[in-house]
Amino acid sequence: MKIGRYFILLILVIPVLILRDFTPNNELKYLSIVDEALRDGHFFTFYHQGELYADKPPLYFWLLMLSKWIWGEYNMFGLSLFSIIPALISIYIMNKWVEEDTTASLRWSGSLMLFTSAFFIGSGLVLRMDMLMCMFILLALYTFYKRYSGKGQPRDRFLLPFYIFMAIFSKGPVGFIVPLITMLVFLLVKRDVRSFCRYFGWREWGILSGFCAIWFLGIYLEGGSTYLNNLLFHQTINRAIDSFDHKKAFWYYGVTF
């Protein structure tokens, strides 16, 4: 799909990006967290009104800091680019993935269908890290598929764990769980699950673990063991076992979705 069409999709949402205001429940809270981090000189550990805030990894907050440094203030249009650009890149990845098996008109139709779906465009317009994580997950899966289909390059052995780490660094463990389970299920359907270590072997695990170790070291040096324990156990294991954000029974979400 030609690059001009991606600009068309961007132009369609510019009025929303310019005219909308910040939502008080999430967006203003993120800006408050960033202000507190800039004031106190924290870059790996975050606090909200003095309370420890380990709910989200630092990548998105770093982007908010970058935007404030560029614009000199919290500019809605500038901040929104960190959601809408990953959304457009996600569409580009999907188009690239199916390029050999589809026509240009079919890819354009698919792009419009995805771009106008409620959950996708909704995530692309709000100031959240969801679309950023989606982009990195898609990059990881596309890289895996290239390697599986014999079209990969040597650098993909590094890029696959790097993209997975960036997905984790965007929004936490789901950035790890989704691509790993997807790869396993794909290989299971292909009756080739034993080859999993060929695509994600000791080298890939080592690269992923190395990036995580650097991140955790930064947290420990800045926030100590209390913050690190909250991130690794309270926000990960305890939330998986007994979520404190989503308390409905599992069938509620099945019906809702």
Segments and roles (model prediction):
Residues 1-257:
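Membrane-integral, polyisoprenol-dependent glycosyltransferases
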